[in-house]
């Protein structure tokens, strides 16, 4: 059996100024190329866990290891190498709306570019760099938006640009934080289908936080559930909706859609 891609052991996270941990003794492992949904009510600690995995929220205890590289925020070079392996798709997209789509997409390459190359790209992009941006946009069916300003795109299109940006990073793991939270049901299915298909085609592991248990069960073979900063359930997608702890989430979702 091959070694897991991601290993989390005893992770405890207390944000600055917080009185209590937002993640408590979290431990699990993920295989390379696997797809996992992270579910739970608001405030359960899902986003904080993703931020801790990426190193943007420091942990007070425990460890995070990706591809045999242990996260150590105190070592700048090691942290930079670690973050190259982990791409983040934030809930708010984090696109620069005044820049063109190809510029936002190629921001995914900043971790492997020098500062000079990044600055030069903003004003004088090379043909090869534009070709790489176009290739990533073709994967998310937005190649015709290469030169459009990001602010002119719809919410679903902006989410797909964020996915293309993550692919350009060439990561081993993608962390997607509520990628369909602001989308209507039809667009939510389209984005999840695209995200899961591309992760499988690229051989990239995927962790996706979701509020909708039925979407988690439909698109993800494994579901981790959080409550009160702890992992309370770890089960396969085909049995997830039968879990008693998932039923309050289902009732809440049904009430919102009624």
Regions found by a protein language model. Name each.
Residues 170:
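Conserved catalytic motifs of ABC-family nucleotide-binding domains
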Residues 54:
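Helix-to-loop junction immediately C-terminal to a conserved catalytic motif
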Residues 210-211:
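H-loop/switch region of ABC-family ATPase nucleotide-binding domains
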Residues 63-81, 123:
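ABC ATPase NBD Q-loop/coupling interface
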Residues 174-177:
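Catalytic Walker B motif of ABC-type/P-loop ATPase nucleotide-binding domains
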Residues 149-153, 157:
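Conserved ABC ATPase signature
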């Amino acid at each position: 059996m091959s070694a897991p891609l991601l290993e989390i052991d005893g992770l405890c996270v207390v944000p600055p100024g917080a009185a209590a941990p937002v993640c408590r003794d979290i431990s699990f492992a993920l295989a390379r190329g696997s797809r996992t949904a992270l579910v739970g009510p608001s405030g359960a600690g899902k986003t904080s866990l993703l931020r801790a995995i990426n190193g943007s929220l420091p942990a007070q205890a425990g460890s995070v290891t990706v591809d045999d590289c242990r996260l150590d925020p105190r070592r700048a070079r090691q942290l930079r190498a670690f973050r190259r392996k982990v791409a983040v798709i934030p809930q708010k997209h984090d696109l620069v709306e005044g820049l063109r789509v190809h510029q936002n997409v190629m921001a995914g390459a900043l971790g492997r570019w020098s500062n000079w190359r990044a600055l030069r790209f903003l004003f004088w992009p090379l043909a090869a760099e534009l070709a790489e941006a176009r290739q990533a946009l073709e994967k998310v069916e937005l190649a015709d938006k290469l030169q459009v300003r990001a602010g002119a795109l719809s919410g679903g299109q902006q989410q797909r640009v964020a996915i293309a940006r993550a692919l350009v990073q060439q990561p081993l793991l993608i962390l997607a934080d509520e990628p369909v939270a602001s989308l209507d049901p039809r667009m939510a299915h389209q984005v999840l289908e695209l995200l899961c298909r591309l992760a499988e085609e690229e051989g990239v592991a995927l962790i996706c936080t979701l509020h909708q248990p039925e979407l988690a069960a439909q698109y993800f073979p494994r579901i981790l559930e959080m409550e009160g900063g702890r992992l309370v359930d770890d089960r396969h997608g085909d049995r997830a909706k039968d879990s008693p702890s998932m039923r309050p989430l289902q009732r809440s979702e049904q009430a919102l859609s009624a």
